[in-house]
């Protein structure tokens, strides 16, 4: 069994770089992952490449409203 099966992670800055690396690793270990990034197009590309265990979430970490919306979308998608 995968170590993260049944778990969900919201990873910020996950459209590229280290965030993307962690998102890939979490999916590989069985987690559902929200690819959260201000670059929604990049997040969508990353989510598409990772498959059905990943969704793209537009999220600006400097905005509480954006954070709340991103969390809500993640819960809705994987609950």
Which ranges hold each PLM region?
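The beta1-alpha1 cofactor-binding region of Rossmann-like NAD(H)/NADP(H)-dependent oxidoreductases
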Residues: 40-44, 59-72
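Intrinsic-disorder-linked linear interaction elements in eukaryotic regulatory proteins
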Residues: 25, 54-56
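Canonical Rossmann dinucleotide-binding motif of NAD(H)/NADP(H)-dependent dehydrogenases/reductases
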Residues: 2-34
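Conserved glycine-rich Rossmann-like NAD(P)H-binding loop of the short-chain dehydrogenase/reductase
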Residues: 29-46
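Conserved residues in the N-terminal Rossmann fold of short-chain dehydrogenase/reductase
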Residues: 35, 57-58
């Amino acid at each position: 069994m995968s170590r993260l099966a049944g778990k969900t992670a919201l990873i910020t800055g996950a459209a590229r770089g280290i965030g993307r690396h962690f998102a890939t690793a979490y999916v590989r270990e069985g987690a559902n992952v929200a690819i959260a990034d201000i670059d929604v197009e990049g997040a969508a590309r990353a989510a598409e490449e990772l498959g059905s265990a990943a969704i793209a979430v537009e999220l600006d970490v400097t905005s509480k409203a954006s954070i709340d919306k991103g969390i809500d979308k993640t819960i809705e998608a994987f609950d």
